Design a protein with these regions (language model features):
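A hydrophobic alpha-helical transmembrane-helix feature that marks the membrane cores
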Residues: 1-245
Length: 245
């Protein structure tokens, strides 16, 4: 069954719902701040899923050499560039900000395709999706019902750990020639990233609650990107762990 039309229809319906909920008289509103942020997160996940499914169904991955280091770094810099542009643009620049965000989310979908293929080929895709969803629900519930357990002072520590983890991952890709050694340390790093992005999800959810209370001009796209990336990275690293790669 071709599920792409269903995803596209869901994207249109959700996009219309966001417009009706997040805007009043064509202006952003702080009302339903948390709900609107999560609607953007769900919309982001739907766009990523659609991108991956389109690439899979039409074999578009054959035009991109994902195993090439040069291709990896090109997509890495493009994705980071679009992320920075999206975060920099004012939420009042509605069309430009949404266009930049859409390109960024699509790039995430393209770069996620090898993980999707890995999960599909090793038959761990469904179980990984379930595990990711379970972790997200549990941690989100904790963040909303026990916000006092989470401190915004975690930010510098989490940021240092994230940068260190990314540098280790890049170093592993560049300098490790033996595939067995690479896989071993890659899995160890993935366990570390699962813990790190779980903590980041708690932190970002707490920050969402604080921003909702202090809202003056809502920035739903920026707010949603942090939690969206936490979820994507949880899924990616859980897939690597379950696939043993």
């Amino acid at each position: 069954m071709n599920s792409i039309p269903i995803f596209l229809l869901s994207i249109l319906i959700l996009g219309f719902t966001i417009f009706k909920s997040a805007y009043r008289d064509n202006k952003l509103t702080c009302k339903k701040y948390v709900l609107n942020t999560y609607l953007y997160i769900i919309l982001s996940l739907l766009i990523v899923s659609t991108t991956v499914l389109v690439m899979d169904q039409y074999g578009l991955d054959k035009y991109i050499s994902f195993h090439s280091g040069m291709v990896f770094f090109i997509f890495l810099f493009l994705t980071i560039g679009m992320l920075l542009l999206t975060m920099f643009l004012s939420p009042q620049q509605t069309i430009l900000k949404h266009l930049s965000w859409l390109i960024f989310i699509t790039l995430i979908g393209i770069t996620l395709f090898p993980i999707y293929k890995l999960g599909k080929m090793t038959s761990v895709l469904s179980s990984t999706l379930f595990t990711t969803l379970s972790i997200v629900i549990i941690l989100t519930t904790i963040a909303f019902y026990k916000p006092e357990w989470i401190s915004l002072s975690w930010q510098p520590i989490l940021l240092v750990l994230l940068v260190a983890g990314i540098l280790l991952k890049i170093g592993l890709m560049v300098f490790t020639k033996d595939i067995g050694t690479y896989n071993k340390w890659s899995i160890i790093l993935s366990y570390g990233f699962v813990i790190l992005f779980s903590l980041l999800l708690l932190y970002d959810t707490k920050k969402l609650q604080v921003n909702a209370k202090n809202c003056k001009i809502p920035n739903y796209i920026n707010e949603s990107i942090s939690i969206f990336l936490d979820i994507i990275n949880l899924f990616s690293n859980l897939t690597r762990i379950k696939a043993g790669n």
